[in-house]
Amino acid sequence: MNYIQKYEKKQIKKTIPIFKSGDTIIIKVWIVEGTKKRIQLFEGIVIAIRNRGFNSSFCVRKVSNGEGIERVFPKYSPIIEEIIVKRHGDVKKSKLYYLRNRIGKSAKIRELISKKTS
């Protein structure tokens, strides 16, 4: 293994919960303002996941004050403090770009309800 692969392997050890497209997640992100550092929450729906090993990333969309905001996060970025899965969505596609054109109730995603076996 070369040095780059060793470095990537060390970075991948960061624990990240399992989530998929359609899930609502909360991301705690480090923000630097001047000399101060603080954590800011970004809550939204995962609309795309790009799996490329160490270079994996995911796109999260939220609507704030009627304006849609999309942000792409590298999965193993040091600015991500924590990822919390709030709810699992029931979707049939892996890329949910069609949500960009929808407003209000039509942009909602059904919640995935797991069946209990007895």
From Swiss-Prot:
UniProt key word Ribonucleoprotein: yes
Gene from which the chain derives: rplS
Protein family (similarity comment): Belongs to the bacterial ribosomal protein bL19 family.
Any one GO cellular component localisation term in the record: cytosolic large ribosomal subunit
GO molecular function, one term: structural constituent of ribosome
GO BP of this protein: translation
Gene3D superfamilies registered for this protein in UniProt: 2.30.30.790
Record-linked Pfam families: Ribosomal_L19
Protein's UniProt name: Large ribosomal subunit protein bL19
Function: This protein is located at the 30S-50S ribosomal subunit interface and may play a role in the structure and function of the aminoacyl-tRNA binding site.
